[in-house]
A protein has these predicted regions:
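Calycin-type beta-barrel ligand-binding domains and close structural analogs
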Residues: 22-47, 53-201
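C-terminal motif of bacterial Sec signal peptides marking the signal peptidase cleavage site
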Residues: 17-18
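Bacterial N-terminal signal peptides that target proteins for export
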Residues: 1-9
Length: 201
């Protein structure tokens, strides 16, 4: 090999090593995030719970999440499946709605129910994927979606563009969901960028 060829080969090896190192780091961060998430969190008038489930056709890191919120003196329950994976060297969260929520209402107490989960039971919230990064300085993970790609049903109304952000630490879970029309006017959700915080129980 000529000196130039050796230099090219060395650069290629260094590039591959850097890529491998990044991939390994993301896998380690995903494992840490998946270990932090399970649990029950309580905030003002609401509770959010995450339980890991076995659904390998989606991902190795899949959770059933259920939120109970007091509205008009009664509890309103919402359910989702969320899955985490590595894509393009980034931690990506995909979210799914359940076709028959009543079938899974005992899912928190009996996560083995989800061993019968199939693709037909799920509806992917396409375009609403969240990218997660680790904030080492504040010992937290931070997630956000791309609003312009995420059209989702807002409570009590039709489709709108959803701006979603979330944080997870060893002590709490926080999130914000704000809805906008095509012109960028806010339709629902908090007016500022503050997150609703839920303490781990």
């Amino acid at each position: 090999l000529t000196m130039a060829e050796r230099a090219v080969a060395l650069c290629a090896l260094l590039f591959l090593a850097a890529c491998s190192g990044t991939a390994d780091l993301r896998k380690a961060e995903l494992s840490e995030l998946a270990g932090l998430l399970p649990g029950t969190y309580e905030g003002a008038g609401a509770s959010v719970a995450f339980v890991p489930i076995y659904a390998p056709f989606i991902s190795d890191n899949v959770f059933f999440t259920e939120e109970t919120r007091l509205q008009g003196g009664r509890g309103e329950v919402s359910q989702r499946i969320v899955a985490f994976d590595i894509s393009d060297k980034q931690i990506v969260q995909a979210s799914y709605l359940l076709a028959d929520p009543a079938r899974w209402r005992a899912g928190l107490q009996h996560p083995d129910l989800f061993k019968s989960l199939m693709e037909a039971d799920l509806k992917l919230l396409a375009g609403c994927e969240m990218l997660w990064v680790k904030d080492k300085e504040r010992s937290r993970f931070v997630g956000a979606n791309d609003r312009k790609n995420c059209r989702s049903s807002r409570p009590g109304s039709g489709l709108a563009f959803l701006d979603a952000r979330a944080e997870i630490t060893a002590d709490d879970y926080a999130r914000s969901e704000r809805y906008f029309d095509a012109a960028g006017r806010q339709l629902a959700g908090p007016r500022d960028e503050a997150l609703d915080r839920f303490r781990r129980q």
